[in-house]
A protein has these predicted regions:
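Short, low-complexity N-terminal intrinsically disordered segments enriched in polar/charged residues
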Residues: 1-29, 33, 37-38, 54-56
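Surface-exposed, charged secondary-structure patches
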Residues: 4-11, 40-100
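Preference for short coil/turn "hinge" residues that link or interrupt alpha-helices
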Residues: 27, 32, 76-78, 105
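Short beta-strand edge/turn micro-motifs at domain boundaries
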Residues: 91-93, 100-122
């Protein structure tokens, strides 16, 4: 029997997986379904440099990019690790060939959505 904590863990991992699959497949509807409208996705503009610049994408920006089709030429696939989970928030690490990404998710009603993402090239 699966309890509510296990269901939540499975749901969080599924959201992270769907996010990456939608990127690899160029599926904007699937992408939008797992992103909070106020999502912020960031990366350091010049990793390791002393400059404090960040590049930032929004949910709408990511959906627009994915609308143009598949976003990678590498073999799709990802390793999703649930790092921590509380009642209504969770942290996930996703490793794929193009990216290493840390996701923060929050529960909204009966749905889990990605609200923050921090990434670097894999």
């Amino acid at each position: 029997m699966v309890d509510s904590v296990d269901r939540d863990r499975q749901a969080v991992v599924e959201v992270a997986t769907q996010y990456f699959e939608s990127w690899f497949q160029g599926d904007p509807q699937r992408m939008r379904a797992v992103l909070h409208p106020a999502l912020s996705k960031r990366t350091a503009s010049e990793p390791g440099a002393s400059m404090l610049a960040l590049e930032e994408d929004t949910a709408d920006g990511l959906v627009a990019i994915v609308s143009r089709g598949s976003r990678t030429t590498v073999e799709p696939g990802q390793d999703v690790t649930l790092l921590d989970m509380s009642k209504d928030i969770a942290a996930v690490k996703v490793v794929s060939k193009p990216f290493i990404e840390y996701l923060h998710l929050a529960r909204f009603g009966d749905r889990w959505l990605i609200v923050n993402a921090l990434y670097e090239p894999g």
